Structures are given as C-alpha cells and as structure tokens.
Regions:
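Non-catalytic, surface beta->alpha helical segment in thiol-disulfide oxidoreductase systems
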Residues: 93-134
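Structural alpha/beta surface segment adjacent to cysteine/selenocysteine redox centers
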Residues: 75-98, 105-107
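Solvent-exposed, acidic/flexible segments
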Residues: 34-41, 45, 74, 114-122
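Local sequence-structure signature of Cys/Sec-based thiol-disulfide redox active-site neighborhoods
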Residues: 23-54
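Sec-exported extracytoplasmic/periplasmic mature domains
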Residues: 49, 53-57, 130-134
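Thiol-based oxidoreductase modules, predominantly thioredoxin-like and allied folds used
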Residues: 60-76
Length: 134
C-alpha cells in the first residue's frame, strides 16, 4: 500500500511539474546578425540589449524575458536563421505561451528607428514586450 501511495504521489508531482512548464509564458527577443554589421545593425543590437538588460532587467530575472543574439554565419545560427527565414540582420520579439510561439518581426521598425530615433525605438520595444506579457 505504501508503494502504491508513493507511486501515485510521484506521478502526480511529475505531471504537475510538466503542466507548469507547458503553461510558462515569456517573451523571447531574438537578434540575428552576420559577421559584418552596419551602423544601424549595431544600433539595433546596442539599444535592444539596453532595453532587455537594463530597462526590463526585472523581467529577465523573473524568467519572463529572454534575449538571444544569433550570429547567422555560424552553423548553429544558420539553423535558426533557416527556421525564421532570416538572411541578414533581423529582430524578432516572440511570445511563448503553452509551448506555442507567436512571432513578431520588428526588423523594419528597428532599421527605421534604432539609429535615427533611439527614444522611439526603445519606447516601442518596451511597450511591445509588455503587451505580449499581458
């Protein structure tokens, strides 16, 4: 009887842990780039990192926000670039909920604003991340 009870509790605990992982909601910011980057690409990189690591550091600490910098010239980066159909510098802000990804391509916005209108770029990026977490 003790073995049965232990087995049942172990199974339930295991199932509950899996359910927690499956319902995890977070935002993942992906910045793709090649070996050579223009001034605008560098601005997107710099200001995205500032938003994620400084302005929204608490979300990173809580696991609600993740950042990945992907060099598409590496074998590992090539695989991700193929998955996202990326062939040059790109910025994605994606929501993950219940194991499903909602992609948001912010590349055009980044190129329009990161270098020439930094304040707008950072403000909109923060707003996008916060909206996706609601």
């Amino acid at each position: 009887m003790k073995r049965f009870l232990f087995f049942t509790i172990a199974c339930l605990s295991s199932s509950w842990g899996m359910a927690q992982i499956a319902t995890d909601t977070y935002v993942e910011v992906l910045y793709f780039h090649g070996k050579q980057r223009c001034a605008t690409c560098k601005a997107i990189d710099k200001h995205t990192k500032e938003v994620v690591n400084v302005d929204l550091a608490e979300l990173v600490k809580n696991g609600k926000l993740r950042f990945k910098e992907i060099d598409i010239s590496t074998p590992e980066g090539e695989k991700l670039a193929e998955k996202y159909r990326v062939s040059w510098s790109s910025l994605y802000v994606n929501k993950w909920e219940n194991g499903k990804e909602e992609r948001n391509d912010m590349t055009r916005f980044g190129f329009q604003n990161a270098r020439s209108n930094t304040t707008v770029f950072k403000k909109e990026l923060k707003q996008k991340i916060n909206r996706l977490l609601k």
